[in-house]
Amino acid sequence: MAAEKTMEKIVALAKNRGFVYPGSDIYGGLANAWDYGPLGVELKNNVKKAWWLKFIQESPYNVGVDCAILMNPQVWVASGHVGGFSDPLIDCKDCKTRHRADKLIEDWNNENNIEFRVDGLKNEELMQYIKDKGVRCPSCGSANFTDIRKFNLMFKTFQGVTEDSKSEIYLRPETAQGIFVNFKNVQRTTRRKIPFGIGQIGKSFRNEITPGNFTFRTREFEQMELEFFCEPGKDLEWFKYWKDFCYNWLLSLNMKKENLKLRDHEKEELSHYSNATTDIEFLFPFGWGELWGIADRTDFDLKQHMTHSKDDLSYFDPTTNEKYVPYCIEPSLGADRVTLAFLCEAYDEEEVAEGDVRTVLRFHPALAPVKIAVLPLSKKLGEDADKVYQMLAKSYYCEYDETGSIGKRYRRQDEIGTPYCITFDFDSLEDKSVTIRDRDTMQQVRIKIEDLAAYFENKFEF
C-alpha cells in the first residue's frame, strides 16, 4: 500500500533538502514569505525555461518582453486595478482574525462536504450565505462577524523624495499590463502580423488577505503570462488552441491526467468583458487548486488603454484591409504555484524491499534540479572522477558527492530527484567506463566515458 502523500512531508523535504526556506529565517521569518534554496532555484528556473521554450522560443507566433515592475500609476487606473482590484474582507469580532469571505465559505463548504461555488457572488450574497449556513470562524469557532468590505490588493509606495499623492506608485499586481502598453512597440519593431503573442516572466505583488498552503498563495510571486492577439471573431478557436496547448504542456512534463481537470467558468462567473475562461486545476495534497487561468479577454484591455492614454492601439490588417482592435487570449500561470505542483506530483515513497522505503522525486528529467550526480566509489578515485564531473558540468547541472556509502549517496540523489547517478569505480581506471544508475528503475548500465556525451544528449528533452 502506497504511503499517503501529505503537504507536511513535502514541506519537510523541501526545507531539509534546500528547495525552499522560510524567508528572513534568522529574524523569525515573515508571514508567508519563502526563499528558494540551491535546489529550489534550479527547479523553478527549469520550469521557467520549459515554459519559455514551448511558449516563446519554439512558437511561430510569439515573442518575449521583460517589462518594469514600477509603471505609470495611470496604467492601473486604466486597467481597473485602482478602482476594482479588491477582495471581500471580513473580521471575526471575537478573536479579531481577518478572513477573505469567499475563501472562508469555500473552506467551510469543504469541511462540511457542501458542493457550492462562490465565484461571481456579490458581497451581500456572500454575507447572506455566511448567516444562512452558520459559517464559523476557523480560529475560534465564533459566528460573530463584521460586515464585508472591499480590500484593495495592490501594494502602494512612493517614488522620489516626497510622500504625497502625486508621487504614489504601485508594485504591479500582474505582468499583463506591461504587455498591453507595449503592444504597439512590439508590433512595430518586430513587424508581426496578427495573430501573434507577447509573453513574459516576472514578479508580481498582491497584498493577499489569507495567503497560505506553502508557496501556493504568497504576496510576492512570479508569473508566466502570454497575451495572444487575434482577429475578432476568431478568438474562441484560438482560446481552444491555447487551452489545449497549456494542458498538453503539463502532460508533457509528467503531470498525470487524474491530477488535472479543466473547469470552464459559468456565465455568471465570467468578467463582463470575457467571452470564455477556463481554469486548469491540480490536485494538491490539500485539495484542488487553480494552476492556470486561460481567458478570452476580447478587446477590453487595449480599448481601456486607448481611452486613457489617447494613443491608437488598433491594428491594420493587410490581409483583410480592415482596421480593428485585436482580441486577446491570456493564458496566465503562476511560476511558484506550478513549481509546487511539479514537486507534489514528483513526490513518491517506494518500498524497494520489506521494511525498506525510499523517498524519490520523480521529476521529468527536463525539470530535475540536478541532472547527473558523479559518485566515486572511493575518495582515492576522486581525481579521475572529478574529470568526468568537469566534462559533464559544461552541459548539465551536476553534483559531485564522495561522502558516505554508495547506497546512501544513491538515496540522497533519489530524494532530490536526480535522474542519473554515475559511479566511478576501480574498474573505471582500466576500462575507461562508468556505471550509470537510473533513478526511477534503479537499473544500471556500463558506458564508456568517451560515450557519455552521446548517451545524455537527448535525455533531458521534452
Curated annotation (Swiss-Prot):
A GO cellular-component term linked to this record: cytoplasm
Assigned EC number: 6.1.1.14
Full protein name: Glycine--tRNA ligase
Annotated InterPro entries: aa-tRNA-synt_IIb, aa-tRNA-synth_II, aa-tRNA-synth_II/BPL/LPL, Anticodon-bd, Anticodon-bd_dom_sf, Gly-tRNA_synthase/POLG2, Gly_tRNA_ligase_bac, GlyRS-like_core
PROSITE patterns, per the entry: AA_TRNA_LIGASE_II
Family: Belongs to the class-II aminoacyl-tRNA synthetase family.
Source organism: Ruminiclostridium cellulolyticum (strain ATCC 35319 / DSM 5812 / JCM 6584 / H10) (Clostridium cellulolyticum)
Keywords, ordered alphabetically: Aminoacyl-tRNA synthetase, ATP-binding, Cytoplasm, Ligase, Nucleotide-binding, Protein biosynthesis
Protein's UniProt keywords contain Cell inner membrane: no
Subunit structure: Homodimer.
Function text: Catalyzes the attachment of glycine to tRNA(Gly).
Binding, substrate: 100, 174, 221-225, 330-334
Subcellular compartments: Cytoplasm
Catalytic reaction list: tRNA(Gly) + glycine + ATP = glycyl-tRNA(Gly) + AMP + diphosphate
Primary localization: cytoplasm
Gene Ontology biological-process entries: glycyl-tRNA aminoacylation
Classification via SUPFAM superfamilies: Class II aaRS ABD-related, Class II aaRS and biotin synthetases
